[in-house]
């Protein structure tokens, strides 16, 4: 299900005529907030996108799913996220220094 949600997010981004490189960081900020298990962080990210009440409830449910397999998600999902953020497209758009600082910040937040 998580892979499906990721694919759906990427497809929607493409259909809305955004460059996926422009959407890299906002997507991963939201993704990291879901992985974190922190409702406060999740609400902060959703506020930036003016999320509706229904969207908040849906993402809370997704966050609960991630929390069920907490150990696996702490170990595996950040590695997947890091691989995607460090994609050649994101690196060329944001620059290596920006990506490094973002990855360091995400690692700190996730307690790695």
UniProtKB/Swiss-Prot annotation:
PROSITE patterns: SCGB. The keyword Signal applies. CDD domains: Secretoglobin. It is found in: Secreted. Pfam families: Feld-I_B (PF09252). Its main location: secreted. Keywords: Allergen, Glycoprotein, Secreted, Signal. InterPro entries: CH2-like, Secretoglobin, Secretoglobin_Domain_sf, Secretoglobin_sf. Glycans are attached at residue 50. One of its GO terms (cellular component) is extracellular space. Residues 1-23 form the signal peptide. Expressed in lacrimal gland, at higher level in males than females. Expressed in the submandibular gland. Belongs to the secretoglobin family. This is Secretoglobin family 2B member 20. It comes from Mus musculus (Mouse).
């Amino acid at each position: 299900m998580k892979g499906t949600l990721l694919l759906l997010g990427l497809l929607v981004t493409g259909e809305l005529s955004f460059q996926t490189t422009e959407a890299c960081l906002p997507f991963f900020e939201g993704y990291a907030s879901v992985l974190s298990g922190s409702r406060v962080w999740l609400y902060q990210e959703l506020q930036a996108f003016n999320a509706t009440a229904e969207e908040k409830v849906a993402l809370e449910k997704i966050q609960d799913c991630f929390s069920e397999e907490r150990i696996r998600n702490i170990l595996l999902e950040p590695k997947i996220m890091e691989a995607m953020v460090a994609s050649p497209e994101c690196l060329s758009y944001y620059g290596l220094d920006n990506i490094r600082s973002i990855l360091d910040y995400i690692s700190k937040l996730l307690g790695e």
